Amino acid sequence: VGFKAGVKDYKLTYYTPEYETKDTDILAAFRVTPQPGVPPEEAGAAVAAESSTGTWTTVWTDGLTSLDRYKGRCYHIEPVAGEENQYIAYVAYPLDLFEEGSVTNMFTSIVGNVFGFKALRALRLEDLRVPTSYIKTFQGPPHGIQVERDKLNKYGRPLLGCTIKPKLGLSAKNYGRAVYECLRGGLDFTKDDENVNSQPFMRWRDRFLFCAEAIYKAQAETGEIKGHYLNATAGTCEEMIKRAVCARELGAPIVMHDYLTGGFTANTTLAHYCRDNGLLLHIHRAMHAVIDRQKNHGMHFRVLAKALRLSGGDHIHAGTVVGKLEGEREITLGFVDLLRDDFVEKDRSRGIYFTQDWVSLPGVLPVASGGIHVWHMPALTEIFGDDSVLQFGGGTLGHPWGNAPGAVANRVALEACVQARNEGRDLAREGNEIIREASKWSPELAAACEVWKAIKFEFPAMDTL
C-alpha cells in the first residue's frame, strides 16, 4: 500500500459536515476571512488542521497514529450576515489534544500558528465551548463570589473600588495616605494601577507596608473590612510569589495580577497560591485590546474571560457599557454572565455561540471601571446587579474636596441606588432623580454631582431592548 506523498486539500480530511460533536470535544467558533479564490470549506478545514494534527503536506508518520481519533474537524460553516467573504467556521477538537489544567497548552493549539496562516486574510476566535470533563481539570478562581462576600461580610450590593492616581510617581507614604483616605470615606477596595510593580520611585515592599497600615487604620475607624489590590505582577514567577507571600504575611485580603502581560502560566501559579493561602485575586486585563479590538482578527474578550475563569481570578475588568451602544451592552452582559453564572445558554444575540456549563466552578466578579462617576451609578447598578465591583478612579480622586469626600459621594450614591431598586423604583428612568434626592442629605455627593453634571447620562434608550 505504501504512503502517498504530496500535498492534498485540507478539506478532504478536515472538513466533515456530517460529524456529530461529542460532549467531551472542545468546540471553537472562528470568524474566517479567506484569501480571494480560497473556498470557505478549504479555509475552515485549514484552520482545523493547522490548529490540531495537520501540516502542509502528507507525512510518513501520519501512518503511525489514528488521525480519526486526534484530528480537529471543521463541522459547520455559515456566512457572516452583512459581511462580504467572512464565515463562521465551527471546529471540534478531541479532548486528548490538550494537557489537563493548562490554559497555556489549550491556547497554544487553538490560537497558535494557525493565526499566521497564509491562505487566510484574517482569523478571529469568537467563542469556545469548554467541555465539563476539561473544566474539571482546573481549579478555577481561588475563592469565587460567595466566599468573597463571606470573607468581607458584605452582601446585597455591588462592591466599590478606586484606582489610586496618579498611577506613577507617588512615593509609598503618599500612596498609602491616598489609600487610607479612600477607604475611610466608604470604599471597600482601593487598587494598584496595573503598571505599578516595583519602580525606582516606589519599591513594592514599601508600598505593601504603607498600604497595609492604611487598611488597618481604615478598618479600625469604620468597622468594615477593607482591602487594597496589591499588584504582585513581576518579571519572574518566583518574584511574583515572593510578593504574594509578603502580602499574606501582612494580613492583606487581596492581591492583584496582570494576567495577559504576566501570562497564563504565571496566573495559574498565583491562583493556586491564593487558594492555598486564603488570598483573593484581582485580575487586570492590560493588553486585552491588542488581542480583542480588531473585529476580524484576534480573539474576542469573551474567550479571554472564559480562559481567566479556568486559570483563576476572583475579579476581572469587563468594560462599563455606560454611554456605549446597545449591542455592546448585550455583548458585555453576555460575557459577564459567562464569568458569574454556573450555566449559560447559547444566545447569538449576545455573542454566545455555545451553551456553556461550568459545573460549579466558582464565579468571577466583573469589574466596571474607566470614566465612570456618580451620575452613572443608577445605570451601573441596574446593568451589573449586585455581583460586581464598581471602580471609580478619577470619579473618587477628582472630587473637589479630596479623596475621602469623593469616596463618601460614591458610597452614598450606591446605597441610594440599591435602596431605590429594593423599593421597586426604575433605575433606568428615575436614576437622575434618585441621585439628586440623595445629594440633599450629602454635601459630598452634591459637590460631586456639580462637578460632573455636564457629562450626559445616556440611559433611557436602554428600555427598547
Curated annotation (Swiss-Prot):
Keywords: Calvin cycle, Carbon dioxide fixation, Chloroplast, Disulfide bond, Lyase, Magnesium, Metal-binding, Methylation, Monooxygenase, Oxidoreductase, Photorespiration, Photosynthesis, Plastid. It comes from Clitoria ternatea. The active site is at K165, H284. The gene is rbcL. Substrate binds at N113, T163, K167, R285, H317, S369. The modification N6-carboxylysine is found at K191. GO terms for biological process: photorespiration; reductive pentose-phosphate cycle. It comes from the Eukaryota. Its EC number is 4.1.1.39. The basic functional RuBisCO is composed of a large chain homodimer in a 'head-to-tail' conformation. In form I RuBisCO this homodimer is arranged in a barrel-like tetramer with the small subunits forming a tetrameric 'cap' on each end of the 'barrel'. It catalyses: 2 (2R)-3-phosphoglycerate + 2 H(+) = D-ribulose 1,5-bisphosphate + CO2 + H2O; D-ribulose 1,5-bisphosphate + O2 = 2-phosphoglycolate + (2R)-3-phosphoglycerate + 2 H(+). Mg(2+) binds at K191, D193, E194. Binds 1 Mg(2+) ion per subunit. This is Ribulose bisphosphate carboxylase large chain. Heterohexadecamer of 8 large chains and 8 small chains; disulfide-linked. The disulfide link is formed within the large subunit homodimers. Belongs to the RuBisCO large chain family. Type I subfamily. Coiled coil: none annotated. It is found in: Plastid, Chloroplast.
